[in-house]
């Protein structure tokens, strides 16, 4: 079940405070965050936010198309290396 509409989107208060400070100053710099659950709001557009994926911070440039999604959606936690390629020996056995 999703979040109630009357509550509004969740944004980490510390992250929102940093975004608002940068907007007031007119600065653009990378903001590190561990809050993958925060929803992207229009105030964040144009900023680069480094989202932690469990190992390192992945820089994510926020665009208008991302509004309403969560930060964690753009920093994958698992790396898919691909399936095993069948070798000649395995195909000969079949």
From Swiss-Prot:
Gene Ontology BP terms: ribosomal small subunit assembly; translation
Lyase keyword on record: no
PROSITE patterns on file: RIBOSOMAL_S19
Keywords recorded for this protein, A-Z: Ribonucleoprotein, Ribosomal protein, RNA-binding, rRNA-binding
GO CC list: cytoplasm; small ribosomal subunit
Disulphide bridges: none
Described function: Protein S19 forms a complex with S13 that binds strongly to the 16S ribosomal RNA.
HAMAP family documented for this protein: Ribosomal_uS19
Name listed for the protein in its UniProt record: Small ribosomal subunit protein uS19
Gene: rpsS
